[in-house]
């Protein structure tokens, strides 16, 4: 993928949203999608997610509890997939991975593998493959919903979400949707990647608070 350069993302075209406004707008936009695809690019190797009991357990250094709590959401994942199927909505996720895996990434790949069991399309690409597109800095965190709106999700240095930049310019949204589709096609399915690279790993060494 050396010749796969990322499209432009003009900052002056985006509308800056607070975290709460982004979450609200995301939910409203997603609910209207019919017979369309969405795309997400994840590049950072560490996030401080909120509202996830499993993530909280990881933060406390409780690895087995973190994995157990992932099991508790299977009914919710199944229901979400059934709703997406009824609406004709397919969600694709591209996960850029650096090695060795951070403790967060090891946990997230367990989470993603489970999501894939319920229909989410997830593929992994090594950071080496995207290096040529990152000469000016890491790729942004991007979500394209239904081909109509793009969110560049913004984070602070600790990995906490602080909001997003909302883009609706047709050319910008279309170019990024096409780019993420190419990254997705070039990546490896989460199932085979997980079996080879993640399943054999011992629990990550975590600091207990």
Model-predicted regions and their roles:
Residues 1-209:
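PLD/PLD-like phosphodiesterase catalytic module centered on the HKD motif
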